[in-house]
Every structure is written in C-alpha cells, then in structure tokens.
C-alpha cells in the first residue's frame, strides 16, 4: 500500500477559507469602485506611497518603539529582495556579512549575487554567542550582521533581552549594522524588544507578509536607522524598479491593513497555528532538544549519531517531507543536526497529527538502532 505523503517542507502560514473570502470581497470592491485600476499600472510604486508606508508602520505595531516616522520606511516586493538590497548596499562586494551559523538558505544565494562573503557566528539556544560574535568582528571586520532571532529558522529559538543587549554593544563597538528580520514575531506574545527598539541607530528592520498571510504575497516593510540612511540607499537604487512593490499587490495589502482585514487574517492564523503546534508538542515534547513555537515551524534534533540528511531522508521514505539543517549551513557542515518541519501545509489538524506521529516513529527507530549499534 502506498504511504500517505505530507509535505512539511515549506515555512508557510496555514491556508484559511477567510483568506479566499477576503480576496473575493476585495476584487468585488475594486470592480464597484469609481476609480479605475488601470491608473495604478501607469507608474511605479517607488518604495511605496505614503499610504503604503503608513500601513507598514501600523502592521509593525509596537515591535518598534517609539513609532518610526514614514521618512524611515521603505516598501519592497518581499523580504528576500530587501535582504539583497541591504546586503549589496550596506556590505558591498568583497566585504563580509555575518549571520547565525544556521540561517535561511536563500541568504547564501543572495550574498553570492552581491559578491559578499558570509561568515557564520556560533549560536546556542539563545541565539548568537556574544564571544564568537566579537571574535568574528575582530577577525573579519564585517559591515553588517543578519539576524533572524525571533523564532529563528531553523532552530525556533527566541533571543532573550540580555543576549540582544550584549549583541547590540558589540555591534556598536565595531561599527556593524544589524539587519533584523522579524518574519514570525507577530505570532508570539510577550516578546523581547526588537533590535530596532533597543538600537535604532544601527538597525535595519525587516518585516515581510508572506509568513503571516500567504506565501505568494511579495511585499515587505523596511525601517531604516534614520531618514538620511534610507535616502542614501534610495538614491543608489532609484534607476532600478525590480524591487518596487507591485501596484495591485500594494493596493490590496494596504487596504487590508487599513481596514483591519489583514489583522483578522493574522489572528485566525495564530489560532490555527496554536492548535497545530499543541499537537506537535503533545507528540514530540519529551524528545531532548525539541523546540516548539507559536509560529509556522518547529525544531527537532536528530538522534545521536545521525546527521540531518540521514534523518530527513528516513522521514521522507516514510512519506513525510522535511528540511534538514544541512540546508541552513551553506557550504559548512552544521554543528547542529536536525530538521525544521513547517506546520502550515497539512490540510487539517488530523494530517498534522499523522505527520508528527510518523516523525516520532522514525526518530525512535533511528535512536534505537544507534543504541544497539553503540552497545555492540
């Protein structure tokens, strides 16, 4: 009998019927509007119009305090494009960008496009290790550090306040800009302050919408340290339109934020994800090193003696597709071997439970096999 296949590969919010309903209502509203949509396609939405940027500030909410002025805000067509723009502008060819030793695979690709060297900083369960961060600053004279430390991908950790303060002090000491990506922060309650709140003078804050609303929404908000810093980048990018938000996309998302539709969809996603992650924790939380979250993925270390690719391959052969930590290490061999399953793609709670129970079964098989092997 064929095994049921479930993909936990993507870090995506769950599909909600309310999202389709919101789109249908939006198209109907556009059709009934006295304003012609064609007018929106006659010119670029250069770094977002004032309404777009105001919507960005509203969406970011209290993740940045005090509230940033619109003159510090840029709207782009997605987080990855934003990272490319900042990497090429803040770091530059031949220079060094620091990241967590495990980070989004796309960051390595974007760095290659920008001819930037990536150096990984060691992490623990609280994120970047200050000692190693300072060591890398002395050794490589980096221009910037990219951090995804609020539900880190892949390990799902959240960097606590004291660690953020330590990283901030070192970044200021060595003149390193912080590129902070809060892809999942809005799923959590009682968060530490963002770097953009603690150290606005050295932080570039990113928040996209694809991890909150739907993977195909290519729109992100960037908050610069100052108006002057943003102007410097915009002057460099002005001749290029590939990073501008698409007019129709920007109109839809700005309208949704302004009317509260986006916030309602986010809250529905939060509720659904909490149900799914509760199942994950119920099935896996007794495994040493397991890290759940209220977000769209979790972390499960491989059994001792098993590398991440062996672990993910065995799970895949059982019909559940997951990403190994090797993908997040670039050209290096990862120090942490495990998997980063996403919980957004299963069709319902029952499929979520099925998938994580299969993962648990494979984990136990591999663990027991290694224990027998070690005892021989």
Where on the chain are the PLM-derived regions?
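Conserved C-terminal alpha-helix-loop-beta "cap" of PLP-dependent enzymes
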Residues: 300-340, 350-354
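PLP-dependent enzyme catalytic core of the Aspartate aminotransferase-like
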Residues: 317, 333-376
